[in-house]
Amino acid sequence: QRQMCIRDRGGTILGTSRQPFKLMRVPDKDGIDKVEAMKHTYHKLHLDCLVILGGNGTHKTANLLREEGLNVVTLPKTIDNDLWGTDMTFGFQSAVDIATDTIDRIHTTATSHSRVFIIEVMGHKVGHVTLHAGIAGGADIILLPEIPYDIKAIKNVIDKRTQAGKRFTILAVAEGAISKEDAKLKKKEYKEKLANRKYPSIAYELAEQIEKETDKEVRITVPGHTQRGGTPCAYDRVFATRVGAKAAELILNEEYGYMVAMRNGETVKVPLEEVAGKLKYVDPNCGLIKEARTIGISFGDEV
């Protein structure tokens, strides 16, 4: 009965917190070791198992607790779809639907004005949401963290569309999109550059560059945390139900230390130590990228 009440709710039912993994073993201001505190609570409550839902950071912590002797089973929950070992994560498709709807709505107004429109989509390190929403929404240019862009290539696409009589150009841009010049910087140098950047995000930096290169007006839309909220789509409800049922099966069989994954349409168990700390990036040479290029979508990398 409880499950029926929450199947159409997004977010976290029990609540959550953000704790950087690198600080898990660092005592807080009260001198409390967070890992030891979790172990103490686990045993105090006489728990059989911890079922942990989350993304990359969550799985690193879950694996740490496994190494500390706790019984753990995890579920892949993140809009980024960046967890290694699973084809899909729940939350991803709902976020793609929201981002796609945003691009669709921009198309409606874009047809009336000779402008460039930038939709900034969530994704700091990986571009799965941007890639799928960009294709589904009919973006002309898609910029991903995995494929550094060249502003000249973007200019060329806009110019060619203008010459062909197109009145607008739409860019789907991951918030972690990076230029070819910045991609050459060392990690520390790039972080310092971001810290000193005058723009609130990549979309605003791109907008200024595009206006300078093309003399086009640029408008920016940032759907932001709307991509993380609202009612989960039907796909995610079914997906979450399936991996949840598989997790219950593992617990009943006392099989601990696994993430429940989806591979080739089937729920499977993947050892946590194989998942923790690994990101699933967009492969620049994957079929989806190649197919997108075939239908004329630019990734801002070809001048």
What do the predicted segments below correspond to?
Residues L75-M88, T111-S112, A136-G137:
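Acidic/polar active-site rim loop that often engages polyanionic ligands
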Residues F21-V72:
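N-terminal glycine-rich phosphate/adenylate-binding segment common to multiple enzyme folds
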